[in-house]
Amino acid sequence: MNLLKIPCDCHLHTDNSFDSETPAALQVARARELGIPYIALTDHCDILEWSDANIARSNAQAMELNALYDDITVLRGIELGEPLQDMDETSRALGLCEYDFVLCSLHNIRGEEDFYYLHPDRAQAADLVRRYFEELLETVKWNQFDSLAHLTYPLRYITERDGVSVDMTPYLPMIQEILSTLAANGKALEINTSGLRNPDGMLLPTADYVELFRRLGGRYITLGSDAHTPEHLAVGMEEGIAAAKEAGFTGVTVFINRQPVEIPFA
């Protein structure tokens, strides 16, 4: 990894997320060690079971850590999960703090557990993935966020972990509409590198979808490792940057006070 060419990591979790035990200070220390100038703390706010205390603490810690150092900008982020499943709670979460960056995600579809807990066969997987993209399209049309996280999230578990192949062809019209809606609304698409921590893992989404986003008018790409521990911070970033470059992007984007700021590639 050529550490000097990693501009940012805008998908990080701390012990303010239910699935991480890493203090925010350790994530910042690791980013500084790697020479990364921008990071965003994006702790989980899965809207059906979020903690306002954790989100407020994450936000405050980002501000405190940002004030400590001149060599890194620590952004106040949030990973807003399943926002359409309780709109009142979503409004409350978005109004709780001032954020630099709202990263939107969908870990579970209505009436189902997180894909992490599901082990569908091929027929069940086809139905679940269809419902996932239907709800994701609704979410993208809602539009109250900055970047869309891990577009192909179900494949992290259905295909990568459980080895169930999924024919994506039937979903391509919905995926095209999702990406064109992001592009038309000036939203970013995340290249999530977490899959590359696994043997034979892949980017979420893969490079062909990044290229499709660009062809449909997409302007902004964010990069995120989805690291829950310091050793995973920035893993796979070179591959993510390569995918963005190959698609025709000239830089990646960070959001400061909810406004896009492009960082040109080195």
Where are these regions (language model features)?
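An N-terminally biased module of ancient metal coordination in phosphate/nucleic-acid-related enzymes
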Residues: M1-E98, Y157-T169, T193, T229-V235, ...
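Short acidic/histidine-rich active-site segments
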Residues: H44, L151, G218-A234, V254-N257
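Anion (oxyanion) recognition and catalysis
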Residues: R32, A183, R214-R215, K245
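Structural preference for beta-strand elements that scaffold enzyme active sites
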Residues: K5-D9, Y38-A40, T73-G77, D100-L103, ...
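Extended substrate/RNA-proximal surfaces in nucleic-acid metabolism proteins
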Residues: D52-A184
